[in-house]
Design a protein with these regions (language model features):
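Conserved GNAT-fold acetyl-CoA-binding loop/helix
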Residues: 29-52
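Short loop/turn motifs at secondary-structure junctions and domain boundaries
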Residues: 54-60, 145
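Residues that form generic nucleotide/phosphate-binding pockets
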Residues: 23, 50-56
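Acyl-donor (CoA/ACP) binding surface of acyl/acetyltransferases
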Residues: 1-19, 23-27, 63, 67-183
Length: 183
């Protein structure tokens, strides 16, 4: 568990499942999906079907919830792009729109990056988004990440092409950024 005042990231517990399902899979077209890879299909699933997968959700290292004042607002996650070389990609979802543009994503990602560098033998963390998600690109910039790749016009959404954006951060850059942020 990592804490920044009223914001907490922590492993998912069984008591969190219903709220997490409501935020992520209860609706066919949730508002957050317009920003989180909307070019990939999203389907609502029943709570029963969601619970059938609970062993892959509860107390996992790669998928934690974000809480603000005890309310679940989203999740942070990671996956291995190539585990033998320690190439990890991370993600974040703020599902409750009341918490958009309030700095919660930046703060949660800060805690998550700390956690990843503190617990895994990584030299780099990164994420992939699309040029239509300006808030996510801004989070990367605020955290000192480098634009490592821009694949032009390869994402198609609502009749328009967008770029795929890949941002990354090296451990030594993070340590320098954290030092500057503390000053």
């Amino acid at each position: 568990m990592y804490i920044d005042n009223e914001l907490v990231i922590r492993p998912i517990e069984e008591k969190d499942l219903e709220k997490l399902w409501e935020l992520t899979y209860k609706e066919e077209s949730p508002e957050w999906k317009k920003w989180d890879a909307p070019y990939f299909e999203h389907k609502a699933i029943s709570y029963e079907k969601y619970l059938a997968n609970k062993d892959n959700i509860i107390n996992q290292d790669d998928y934690w919830i974000i809480e603000v004042d005890g309310n679940i607002i989203g999740k942070v996650s990671y996956y291995w792009e190539h585990k033998p070389s320690h190439w990890l990609e991370m993600g974040i979802g703020i599902y409750d729109s009341h918490y958009w543009s309030g700095g919660f994503g930046t703060r949660a990602f800060t805690l998550w990056i700390d956690h990843l560098f503190n617990t895994l033998p990584l030299v780099r963390v990164g994420f992939t988004t699309w040029s239509g998600n300006h808030r996510m690109v801004k989070v990367g910039e605020k955290l000192g990440m480098t634009l490592e790749a821009r694949l032009r016009k390869c994402r198609y959404y609502n009749g328009k092409y967008y770029d795929s954006i890949r941002m990354g951060l090296l451990r030594e850059e993070w340590e320098a950024t954290k030092f500057i942020m503390k000053m």
